[in-house]
Amino acid sequence: LSQRAGGSIGAALAPVVEGSRALLLEVQALTSPSQLPAPRRVANGVDYNRLLMLAAVASRRAGLELSGQDIIVNVAGGFKISEPAADLPLVLAMASSLYNCPLDAEMFAFGEVGLSAEIRAVSQAQRRVTEAARLGLKKCILPETSLEGLKIPKGMKAIGVRTLRQAINAVVSKDRNKDRSEDLAWEPDGALEPG
């Protein structure tokens, strides 16, 4: 992460639990209009079939026009991610690339994406949030169901989402000039901020 350019297009941070520790990894995505009848899908560090499923769900259920796009995804540093908690940041990276819109450099995300584009809770949410806060991150996109009982570190905004479309709309602005996450932000005491 020390070499990470802040606010990169097509890059999102994913807190991944490996054994007894949480790691913050950068997932990267590049979308490009395909010149082929069957657009290419390339997965480095993530399961290829998972990428196919996430691209299909994002296209069909969340309105991302990915069907005519080549999609290349990568986990920086040569890491491999096998847990579904990286689903949400991976799709956010794809949306960022598709709309050519950088994600907030202080934002991280986690959550499993279901076939209906619902965002499902994953285990060890507290560990993920605590590790990200320790590294100075200030904004978290996570499953709404994970907010219950979660201790949000002081100075961090947690944005609970139910659907993939809601998550994308919260962080990727198609006009590239408006940060939508403020509309949905939760303060540590759980009070909804005015939008």
Regions flagged by a language model, labelled:
Residues 1-195:
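Peripheral, non-AAA+ core regions of ATP-driven protein-machinery
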